[in-house]
Amino acid sequence: MDAAELRATQAPIKERYKADPNAALITLKAKGSIDAEGIACKVETGRALAVAGLHPATGGSGLELCSGDMLLEALVACAGVTLKSVATAIELPLKTGIVSAEGDLDFRGTLGVDKEAPVGFREIRLRFDVDTAAPQDKLDLLLKLTERYCVVYQTIRSGPKVSVTMQRV
């Protein structure tokens, strides 16, 4: 897809959202079932069933997916799609690119070993390695716009309001 195709595809969508801001509000959903036997949660991905379990650093076997890894994978996926979309829109040719994310966790927090240890990532690093002949000012713009428009990056960075409920079934 080139810049013209991208604009043509998105123009009517953007116009609809400008005319009716409520049309832009969409609720995305995820659902998982708690495994009756093991310590795992089966997440419906729409394509397959992803089984998440304990990370080996917390006693897991390593056979199931780690939800921390899944968070980083979601960040990489969203950032990669956003980067490519922005590059296309600003007509910055990319030959190839690699998106990587890594994050630091102190597992004492989630295991309740140390009440002062944080539960969750202390730091996340997102990196783009791109093969392009574009000038540095265009790369700076690409990075700035990718950060601005990446949903997962902005969600992690901004920390939205989150509510948690529980009910009997």
Predicted regions: what they are:
Residues M1-E73, S85-V169:
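Extended beta-strand/beta-hairpin segments
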